[in-house]
Amino acid sequence: MPYEFKIGMYVNELRLPLDDALATAKELGADYPWFTNLDEGGHVGQMSDAEADKIAELYAKYDVKMMQLSAGSPFKFIDLVEVSAGSIGEHPTFKEEFSHLIRSMELAKRMGTDTVAAYTFAWPGEYTADKPTWPMRWATQGGIISEVEMGKLVQAFKLVVEQADRYDVNVSLAMMPWNYTNTTLHFRELADRVGSDRLKVMWGPADNYNCGEPDVATAGFSNVQPYVDSIHIKDLRVNDGAIIDFDYVPFGEGDVPWQDILHNLGEANSDVVLSLATHFEHPQGRVAAMQKNMDNLQQMIASL
């Protein structure tokens, strides 16, 4: 049988109530929408069973499946250098966000998914001191993670996968430029050292490229292939990487080698969801931006 791409959507970018967002996603052709927290529904990490059931009913109403459940952005803003090795579980912010992540694990299957989302800590000063390590990271194609810091990451995510085993769910890590899994090499080292099949990745080729990783289509794909369960679909143009000068553009109109990536996914028969996002501005608004990216994605798929 010919390879069929599964298409999802990060519906927070639509800035619509969830009911309308799911309807829009379905209309645009995305069968696997997902969200982080909801303005009308509160924090996933503090959600009641009844609230979760209402959301599951909305998904059933539109005949769509939740790609993953995200309790906000667990660990995204925690500066790793401020976390003490050996006592990660006692760090106040980690402790709070870990509890939210565990609650998402408790709710995941109730809401129709077996995957929850997590992030991988901030590089030093990333959100507090204007990204002081960025020039070094760009020059080294993603940065250098010390053994001490990698050890902390491994400790943290071994705690996470212990809970994932308990609740029989997978944990998909994001690949943000501002976090430690900003490249496929960094993710692969962390995943291999944690050593759990529970750990997955929402691969972000655009973010990898934006961090200076040179070959996201082939070497990058090879690095993430054993772990990838979804792909963050957006495009960008890097103007001057050393000073973080880049522009988000419609899918297929930037620097990211998406044609090669989609081809490789099909050749490998990868069981992944293409999670459509935008990030660029459209004169007719957010839904129009998502429609533009969906149209471009479908055209590229048809051309393979």
Walk through the language-model features, giving the residues of each:
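Active-site beta-loop-alpha junctions enriched in small/polar residues
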Residues: Y10-L14, T36-L38, A71-P74, F121-W123, ...
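Histidine-acidic metal/acid-base catalytic patches
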Residues: M1-G8, R15-G29, D53-A60, E106, ...
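Glycine-rich, proline-tolerant flexible connector loops at the mouths of alpha/beta enzymes
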Residues: T36-A56, T120-Y127
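Conserved beta-strand positions in the central sheet of alpha/beta enzyme cores
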Residues: W34, Q68, A117, D229-H232, ...
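Residue-level detector of anion-binding/catalytic polar loops
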Residues: D31-Y32, K65, D114, N170, ...
